[in-house]
Amino acid sequence: MLSNVTNNLQLWDHDYDWSADGDEWEYQADRSGVSYSEWKSSLVSHLIEPYARDADVLEIAPGHGRWSEFIIGMCRHATLVDLGPKCLEYCRTRFAEHGNVDYFLTTGTQLPYHAAGVIDFVFSYDSFVHMSADVIQSYMAEIARALRTGGTAIIHHAEIADPASYQQTYTGQRSAINSSMVRGFAEQHGLTVRRQSAVWDEARKIGCAEDAITLITK
């Protein structure tokens, strides 16, 4: 667990240049056969807006706020949780004019202590794909603690066919995780998995390529 957390902290808060604040990651739009702006709009309309509007939202690993800007613009209150001090500081500056945001620096597995049974929606995209199984399991326990009864979590994660034989060869590569494992972690902590799929817009077949989205309720 510690090595995965340490490696991700080094990569995303020190080594990575964030050339377009996360918008440089366009390959999932390419694989969906649509423009990046269409892909991004589809994700917001299917995975964020139905759950974040007028809600208390917690985002895990916002990075430079690629999705946070949409969440903050429609939610009642947003809590941004990140492992990287520089990423959190960037978000503080970027969203300084918004009064409905607070920030929490995690050590890599925990959510704010005060966020117990008060969160309507937990969202994370492009972060759990890099987390090891033990880190995800720890976060799942925290998500269960943070969500209100009836609350929802949407997690984007890796979908590796055979995690047991998979070898991560560099930091930032997909971790040895699949939907079955994520389902098990969620159910272990009393959460219900409602849907797991690589596609969120069935009509246009827009999704996250070789990864998966898990929708969870409490």
Where are these regions (language model features)?
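Class I (Rossmann-like) S-adenosyl-L-methionine-dependent methyltransferase catalytic domain
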Residues: 1-54, 60-115, 131-138, 142, ...
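Short catalytic micro-motifs in class I SAM-dependent methyltransferases
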Residues: 126-127
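A conserved beta-strand element that flanks and buttresses the S-adenosyl-L-methionine
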Residues: 123
